[in-house]
Amino acid sequence: MDLARQIAMELLDIQAVYLRPKQPFTWASGVKSPIYTDNRVTLSYPETRTLIENGFVKQIQEHFPNVDIIAGTATAGIPHGAIIADKMNLPFAYIRSKAKDHGVGNQIEGRVYSGQKMVIIEDLISTGGSVLEAVTAAQSQGIEVLGVVAIFTYQLAKAEQAFREANIPLVTLTDYNQLIKVAKVNGYITADQLVLLKKFKEDQMNWQS
């Protein structure tokens, strides 16, 4: 089994991902969704965590071999980023969603320098907005952001367009298409539910109709 399928299976097994097309979840945006993802759960499972961190290292070495600092997004990207930086013997920093309103007002915590080549770690890509704000924060300090690496993406068109417009490569360990295929093969969903899940990816507002 390749890495993308293996990680998709792990996410389903440990219930980091729930698929519920007939009883959709409500996202913070108000969107009714057949999927809910909480990749923080992966940190509680050592074997899953190791599989993910080794996957991150492999993808970074393959796609961004010139990296010289790892950053995590606050908060979900911090633990993964710190482990990866340790495995790769690289400096680590993390990026807040906004600058602190006290102290020295840092948005990036850790020692960073203009000219560094950074890879940013995220756990989940939905619209891509929050991690691309982290990219902008790093770039504003003269850092070259080589790309973003995440555990999982919903593969929404809005996110893919946002990364293209920002000219930032996105690499993920697994993705929505892979996950729903694995879910069907392993009996997590029925054929009818698979149809609904595919419709959601294409049209988040009208997939239930």
From Swiss-Prot:
Belongs to the purine/pyrimidine phosphoribosyltransferase family. PyrE subfamily. Orotate binds at residue 126. Homodimer. This is Orotate phosphoribosyltransferase. Its cofactor is Mg(2+). It comes from Streptococcus agalactiae serotype Ia (strain ATCC 27591 / A909 / CDC SS700). Gene3D superfamilies: 3.40.50.2020. One of its GO terms (biological process) is 'de novo' UMP biosynthetic process.
